[in-house]
Amino acid sequence: MASKIETLKANLEAALGARAVSLVEAVGELTLVVKASDYLEVAKQLRDDRSLGFEQLIDLCGVDYQTYGDGAYDGPRFAAVLHLLSVANNWRLRVRVFASDDDLPIVPSVVDIWNSANWYEREAFDLYGIVFEGHPDLRRILTDYGFIGHPFRKDFPVSGYVEMRYDPQEKRVVYQPVTIEPREITPRVIREDRYGGLKH
């Protein structure tokens, strides 16, 4: 008798065919990678096909692969990752779609398929700058409206670009350039044979 994950994998391969760029099992979960051009069609089929039945989107996030694998990674930089749940079939699926342009990452919105994607897509836009084409209200959700950049991108400076503080003379919050100085932290090297009673 086939396990639940083997059944799901067989159903996905039969339903999606060549539209599945890859389908990998790791840590007891399947990850499906699809092209951005097939993304909406595949998402609808994942929801509507009774052999799959993913009626719930439980999470969606952005990923920046710029420094993935210590810089050895040579694929697209940004991806949107969905986590889907089928209550009827009691199985889960991770779906990954890569944006083709690293400078302006654009991925179709799945809000019309799973309305729970609304705020998740806004969060991925706010933090990673991934534009979800067709989203009804794509605006920042976590950072300030005047915020510059996208803070979860790997090239975003740790200290940010500006800092805000309350100015008692102006009686309002003001923005100013960052005043934090970058520091080089040198790791401590212990050169003793016995440190803290430990034998080497």
UniProtKB/Swiss-Prot annotation:
One CC-aspect GO term: plasma membrane
InterPro entries per record: NADH_DH_suC (IPR010218), NADH_quin_OxRdtase_su_C/D-like (IPR037232), NADH_UbQ_OxRdtase_30kDa_su (IPR001268), NADH_UbQ_OxRdtase_CS (IPR020396)
Gene3D superfamilies reported in the protein's UniProt record: NADH:ubiquinone oxidoreductase, 30kDa subunit
Chief location of this protein within or outside the cell: membrane
Subcellular location per the Swiss-Prot or TrEMBL entry: Cell inner membrane
Membrane topology: Peripheral membrane protein
Disulfide partners: none
EC assignment: 7.1.1.-
A Pfam family: Complex1_30kDa
PROSITE patterns assigned to the protein according to its UniProt record, in alphabetical order: COMPLEX1_30K (PS00542)
Top enzyme class: translocase
Catalysis performed (reactions): a quinone + NADH + 5 H(+)(in) = a quinol + NAD(+) + 4 H(+)(out)
Keywords assigned: Cell inner membrane, Cell membrane, Membrane, NAD, Quinone, Translocase, Transport, Ubiquinone
One function term, GO molecular function aspect: NADH dehydrogenase (ubiquinone) activity
Family to which this protein belongs: Belongs to the complex I 30 kDa subunit family.
Purpose of the protein: NDH-1 shuttles electrons from NADH, via FMN and iron-sulfur (Fe-S) centers, to quinones in the respiratory chain. The immediate electron acceptor for the enzyme in this species is believed to be ubiquinone. Couples the redox reaction to proton translocation (for every two electrons transferred, four hydrogen ions are translocated across the cytoplasmic membrane), and thus conserves the redox energy in a proton gradient.
Subunit-structure text: NDH-1 is composed of 14 different subunits. Subunits NuoB, C, D, E, F, and G constitute the peripheral sector of the complex.
HAMAP family, per database record: NDH1_NuoC (MF_01357)
The protein, known as: NADH-quinone oxidoreductase subunit C
Species of the source: Burkholderia mallei (strain ATCC 23344)
